[in-house]
């Protein structure tokens, strides 16, 4: 009987140590959606870096739903992850999820989109304001000042949409562009197509379009082609599909981000935090214009 108790105790101790080790080595990335190639690239970059550094990485998809995002973070705190990388569905709505992680003493790193509330150790993103301005300057350089333009906006409430729009409006004012319309299409290709169809009907003299991501830009391409018009379209992100569209001449340009680098940096920063290092509050990732 004593031997049996010893064996059970040893097994329980071994199990406890295994769970503790697993928790110690586990971090997570929560993405707003995996139905977008940009965030798939971000996931791939995080997974590659986690493998290099020896971490078990949990990947969760919030499906563009703040309630799903909150549920994901709650699940991760219960599972005992040591750090959470989060790409918010919405900069305000994510605050509840971040505060939940804060209460559980789990460090949070935001990727691409910021959070308006809650304690975030570090934010990693492109300079979206600069990128929006780069897009406007590109249009002015190619089409000319006073060009008639339309903007397709991303998801309202996200820092990326707000900041890209802010940068684009700087160029609109600086370069005297004539903004005919600016309407959300939620970073979605199908919505980009539908919104662009309506805007083309209302603004047949449009000369250029700035879409706040490549998915909306590609939707706009289809709408313009179907209408038999020639309109210059500039996207944002530098996704594989976006870059191919530039090479084919369907997009005039894309403001290229490096989502894989953003994901990898997130894991790097988590590693530094968990090893007692200090990190910068904001970490910018360079942008560049890719054009034909």
What residue ranges belong to the model's regions?
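A residue-level marker of the well-folded mature domains of exported/periplasmic proteins
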Residues: 3-4, 21-292
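Gram-negative bacterial Sec-dependent N-terminal signal peptides
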Residues: 1-23
């Amino acid at each position: 009987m004593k031997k049996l108790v010893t064996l059970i105790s040893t097994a329980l101790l071994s199990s406890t140590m295994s769970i503790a080790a697993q928790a110690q080595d586990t971090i997570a990335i929560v993405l707003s959606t995996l139905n977008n190639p940009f965030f798939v690239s971000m996931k791939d970059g995080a997974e590659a870096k986690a493998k290099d550094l020896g971490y078990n990485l949990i990947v969760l998809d919030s499906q563009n739903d703040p309630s799903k995002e909150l549920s994901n973070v709650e699940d991760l705190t219960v599972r005992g992850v040591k750090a959470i990388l989060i790409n918010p569905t919405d900069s305000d709505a994510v605050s509840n999820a971040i505060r939940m992680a804060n209460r559980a003493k789990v460090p949070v790193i935001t990727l691409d989109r910021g959070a308006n509330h809650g304690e975030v150790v570090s934010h990693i993103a492109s300079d979206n304001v600069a990128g929006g301005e780069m897009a406007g300057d590109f249009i002015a350089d190619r089409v000319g000042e006073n060009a008639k333009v339309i903007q397709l906006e991303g998801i309202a409430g996200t820092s990326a949409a707000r900041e890209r729009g802010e940068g684009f409006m700087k160029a609109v004012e600086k370069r005297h562009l004539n903004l005919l319309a600016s309407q959300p299409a939620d970073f979605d290709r199908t919505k980009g197509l539908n919104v662009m169809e309506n805007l083309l009907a209302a603004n047949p003299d449009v000369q250029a379009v700035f879409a706040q991501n490549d998915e909306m830009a590609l939707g706009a391409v289809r709408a313009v082609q179907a209408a038999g018009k020639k309109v210059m379209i500039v996207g944002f992100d530098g996704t594989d599909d976006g870059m191919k569209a530039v090479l084919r001449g369907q997009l005039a340009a894309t403001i290229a981000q490096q989502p894989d680098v953003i994901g990898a940096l997130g894991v790097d920063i988590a590693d530094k935090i968990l090893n007692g290092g200090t990190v910068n509050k904001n970490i910018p990732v360079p942008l560049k214009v890719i054009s034909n």
